[in-house]
């Protein structure tokens, strides 16, 4: 059988074009993910700098000032230092669990950002179960902490891992019930739909005013999830040296450091999305898509998306002042006080709040 030369050339060019299209498709798929990771990295650097400056102001001392203008590059300098430090392994520990633990803590928190809408249609994955996917993913992080504590073969590390697991279980249930109340009010579990449900009445339509009890419980539970003071028992210095982080050094210790700030940022972003109206301007009957005419005007779409991202970030970083100042205001709880607060107070109150929300929705039908 004789094949024409032109046919062979056509087949080769078609296969080459197909492979190029596949490469372009992969690149186009990676662009938003890499953009999100870059944005998160910058966001964490800003949070670390803000916390150090606010903490210095509260304690009436001078914060970081030499690494870059106003000390903005101090976190980057600390990260670079940890990157070049030696990774030490405990001699009798489980090296596999010891190495996997920090990665699970970081990856599970990073995946939570995929369902956060930073602007109108500016979300990596707009899912019908977005908020509950976040809760499911965030519940994986304590497994990594427990693995780190167990793999270290150290009594302080293991006790810190057990505390982290117990604390996470105690406060995830009230947090989930608060999110369920928001879903009932918005008639959706999509993060985009929840933001749009708050846009009609502007500032007065925020879920903060419709769910004040849920907001307080969500805030307390998110502080406990992030292991911020007064809920930092898994790594209490006076009791457990550094908890599950005791045996870590170098980049692995840096991963735990990054994971804690990733968790703090994602919690604040979800507060902005669920309770503070997300990307919307706080003016009644004016939403970002309608104001900038998204459907017709392409320039307005770009400008509106940028404005939505800025509004979301402003709300997030303004809210971040509360957990940062709380760190230097309240004393650490005992373990029994922490568990009593979660099981005996927050859980019944969040159940009552869910019952009230369900009743109001039924009567409004």
UniProtKB/Swiss-Prot annotation:
User: Which superkingdom is the protein from?
Assistant: Eukaryota
Q: Does the keyword Transmembrane apply?
A: yes
Instruction: Enumerate the subcellular locations listed in this protein's record, separating them with semicolons.
Output: Plastid, Chloroplast thylakoid membrane
Name the membrane topology term: Multi-pass membrane protein
Q: Which GO terms describe its cellular component?
A: chloroplast thylakoid membrane
The record's InterPro entries line, in alphabetical order, gives: NADH_UbQ_OxRdtase_su1/FPO, NADH_UbQ_OxRdtase_su1_CS
Q: Which residues form a coiled coil?
A: none
What does the record list as GO biological process?
aerobic respiration; photosynthesis, light reaction
Q: Which GO terms describe its molecular function?
A: NADH dehydrogenase activity; oxidoreductase activity, acting on NAD(P)H, quinone or similar compound as acceptor; quinone binding
Transmembrane residues, as ranges?
30-50, 104-124, 129-149, 253-273, 302-322, 338-358
The reaction(s) catalysed by this protein are: a plastoquinone + NADH + (n+1) H(+)(in) = a plastoquinol + NAD(+) + n H(+)(out); a plastoquinone + NADPH + (n+1) H(+)(in) = a plastoquinol + NADP(+) + n H(+)(out)
Q: Does the keyword Coiled coil apply?
A: no
Query: Keywords on this record?
Result: Chloroplast, Membrane, NAD, NADP, Plastid, Plastoquinone, Quinone, Thylakoid, Translocase, Transmembrane, Transmembrane helix
Q: What is its EC number?
A: 7.1.1.-
Disulfide bridge positions per record: none
Homology family: Belongs to the complex I subunit 1 family.
Supply the PANTHER family for this chain.
Answer: NADH DEHYDROGENASE SUBUNIT 1, NADH-UBIQUINONE OXIDOREDUCTASE CHAIN 1
Q: How does it assemble?
A: NDH is composed of at least 16 different subunits, 5 of which are encoded in the nucleus.
Function statement? NDH shuttles electrons from NAD(P)H:plastoquinone, via FMN and iron-sulfur (Fe-S) centers, to quinones in the photosynthetic chain and possibly in a chloroplast respiratory chain. The immediate electron acceptor for the enzyme in this species is believed to be plastoquinone. Couples the redox reaction to proton translocation, and thus conserves the redox energy in a proton gradient.
UniProt protein name: NAD(P)H-quinone oxidoreductase subunit 1, chloroplastic
The gene behind this protein is: ndhA
